[in-house]
């Protein structure tokens, strides 16, 4: 969701030696699946190019005659997915403009409630505005708001990561218990299982009070107003 965002004038994905973007169907721009690695370093480009295609060096037109300087894997994006991506990237500026407009309208509605605080953005001008992350005073209040939003049918698009099975470590029991389909190297297994004993209380305090609202490009002003008012009514009722 960070594609198109910037930090101090530099585009995200271009700040370090390499950057990555996912293009699955929930991202700001999508190919349906797949992603990219971006780099200005020729050595990283060549290694990434081979690593994602079984280790092929791509120096000729005969795949069977390619050399294999290292082991690679099949992480290629298909030509059909790439074609969708090329069409999408032409509209990225349009997507970002809509995202920012809809984000700002909804945030202004939520900001009516003094008990709500918002995620600190290190560079507001560079925010891609794909989500609004907002916070309530306590875990108990937040869970009550989530439950009431669910009861009223307005929870979809609002994510409580703290109770999510995938997006926050609290419920990653498969990782903490090293549940795999193949044997891990003992060193790697030990590092993985360390996660079960780590203290995430500081993160828990933040995440247990956070709800993230996804910003849709399809909303019109009336829909945003209606959505925001319903959310505000639920929050006020719980508070």
What are the residue ranges of the model-derived segments?
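Active-site region of PLP-dependent enzymes
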Residues: 2-8, 15-131
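Short beta-strand-to-loop capping motifs
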Residues: 39, 134-138, 215-217
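Short, conserved charged micro-motifs
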Residues: 139-145, 220-226
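Conserved PLP cofactor-binding pocket of PLP-dependent enzymes
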Residues: 56-64, 105-109, 146-211
């Amino acid at each position: 969701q960070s594609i198109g965002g910037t930090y101090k004038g530099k585009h995200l994905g271009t700040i370090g030696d390499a950057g990555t973007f996912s293009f699955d169907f929930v991202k700001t721009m999508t190919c349906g699946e797949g992603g990219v690695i971006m780099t200005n370093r020729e050595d990283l480009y060549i290694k990434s190019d081979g690593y994602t295609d079984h280790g092929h060096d791509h120096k000729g037109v005969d795949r069977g005659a390619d050399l294999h300087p290292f082991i690679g894997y099949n992480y290629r994006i298909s030509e059909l997915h790439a074609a969708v991506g090329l069409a999408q990237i032409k509209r990225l500026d349009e997507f970002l403009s809509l995202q920012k407009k809809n984000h700002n309208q909804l945030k202004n509605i939520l900001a009516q409630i003094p008990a709500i605080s918002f995620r600190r953005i290190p560079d507001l001008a560079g925010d891609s505005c794909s989500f609004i992350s907002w916070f309530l005073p306590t875990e108990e209040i937040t869970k009550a708001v989530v439950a009431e939003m669910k009861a009223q049918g307005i929870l979809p698009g609002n994510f409580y990561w703290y109770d999510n099975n995938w997006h926050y470590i609290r419920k990653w029991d498969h990782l903490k218990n090293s549940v795999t389909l193949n044997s891990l190297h003992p060193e790697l297994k030990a590092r993985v299982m360390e996660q079960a004993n780590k203290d995430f209380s500081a993160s828990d305090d933040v995440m247990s009070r956070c709800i993230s609202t996804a910003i849709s490009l399809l909303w019109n002003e009336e829909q945003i107003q209606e959505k925001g008012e319903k959310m505000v009514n639920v929050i006020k009722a719980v508070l």
